[in-house]
A protein has these predicted regions:
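Substrate-binding groove of N-acetylhexosamine-processing glycoside hydrolases
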Residues: 2-3, 10, 25-166
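Short acidic/His/Gly/Ser-rich catalytic and metal-binding motifs that mark active-site loops
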Residues: 13-22
Length: 166
């Protein structure tokens, strides 16, 4: 593949990196106040490595992450990074920000493109449903990747991705 997705959204940074003595030493050396700021040198090194190996890096378009607010350290993203919008409800904001910043965008919003979400209410046992909305295949087929914005404002959308997590 010409693309490599670097992930990063599952890292419990504040819990783990605040308890790591090496991380704390690096924070002090770099003058950082929050453990989440360590993502700056991490992603910088990873992005350089991927590009040196003639691949296109892909990152999640993080705007309002719980651990931590990722927009603190990732916007503006480097322009040669393709982003994936996934977080339910925040895709229109990601669409606008990536247009302004010049990043290519893949659309995969959870409320339309997560194909492993329940098809009917009650499809998943309550102990296994952490708040996934019902997302029928009909709803997925009706998805408008441009969210109704003018064509010139969605020219940076490079595709749609349906996701299945297991």
């Amino acid at each position: 593949s010409d693309y490599i997705h670097l992930g990063g959204d599952e890292a419990v940074i504040e819990k783990n990196w605040t308890q790591c003595s090496r991380c704390q030493a690096m924070m002090k050396k770099l003058g950082y106040q929050k453990a989440s700021q360590l993502m700056i040198p991490f992603f910088s090194r990873m992005l350089s490595f991927v590009q040196e190996n003639i691949k296109t890096p892909i990152l999640w378009c993080e705007l309002d992450n719980i651990y931590p607010p990722a927009n603190d350290y990732l916007f503006p993203y480097p322009k040669n990074v393709t982003l994936v919008s996934w977080r339910g409800g925040l895709t229109p904001t990601c669409l606008e920000l990536t247009r302004k910043h010049g990043n290519p965008l893949i659309m995969a919003p959870g409320e339309y493109a997560y194909l492993d979400y329940p098809q009917l209410k009650g499809d998943f046992p309550e102990f296994n449903n952490w708040g996934m909305p019902v997302t029928t295949l009909e709803k997925s087929y009706q998805f408008d990747p441009g969210y109704g914005v003018p064509a010139e404002d969605q020219a940076h959308i490079t595709g749609v991705m349906g996701t299945l997590w297991g």
